[in-house]
From Swiss-Prot:
Effect in UniProt of substituting L21A: No change in activity
Membrane topology: Single-pass membrane protein
Source organism (scientific name): Escherichia coli (strain K12)
Species classification: Bacteria, Pseudomonadati, Pseudomonadota, Gammaproteobacteria, Enterobacterales
Subunit structure, interactors included: Interacts with MgtA.
Protein name as it appears in the record: Small protein MgtS
Length: 31
């Protein structure tokens, strides 16, 4: 169970980080 939770947290973090990067760069390119 703990292993699955670790993987879930890692995937969630990557998705959130990717979304943050996408938003950051899209705002940057709007200029």
């Amino acid at each position: 169970m703990l292993g699955n939770m670790n993987v879930f947290m890692a995937v969630l973090g990557i998705i959130l980080f990717s979304g943050f990067l996408a938003a950051y760069f899209s705002h940057k390119w709007d200029d």
